[in-house]
Regions:
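Primarily secretory-pathway and cell-envelope proteins
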Residues: 1-65, 95-116
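Short, solvent-exposed secondary-structure boundary motifs
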Residues: 12-15, 70-73, 91-92
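A generic structural micro-environment signature
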Residues: 42, 72, 87-90, 108-110
Length: 116
């Protein structure tokens, strides 16, 4: 959590199933999917909130929770930002410092991976 993000979520959300995530993309709006470690190596982010800021700023304006996503080919862990205005953004690390720069394009889904 960044210093500005002061609340926590007491009840982790259960895994989501195939087809249960709705993206609201179109003219001037895209989405961001952040693939995360699965936790088998101890580095998992399941249940952790990840935050997005406007590029050049360190204050998050939106956050989402990394969750298990159950797909026909197996489970993956990801955080989904379903509707983000076109622009330049920074995914903040757990310490609130800039971690990944991303560009959101109109009507498209941008994907990045935190899996190392």
């Amino acid at each position: 959590m960044s210093p500005e993000h002061t609340h926590t979520h007491e009840h982790p959300l259960p895994p989501s199933g195939n087809g249960t995530v709705l993206l609201d993309i179109g003219d001037g709006v895209g989405a961001l999917v952040v693939h995360a470690p699965d936790g088998l190596d101890g580095a998992g982010l399941d249940g952790v909130e990840i935050e997005l800021s406007h590029r050049g700023e360190r204050q998050a304006f939106v956050h989402t929770e990394v969750r298990e996503r159950r797909l026909p080919e197996g489970s993956v862990y990801a955080g989904v930002f379903p509707a983000v205005a076109v622009g330049e953004y920074t995914l903040l690390g757990l310490d609130g410092a800039p971690d990944h720069e991303v560009t959101i394009s109109s009507g498209k889904v941008t994907e990045i991976s935190l899996v190392r």
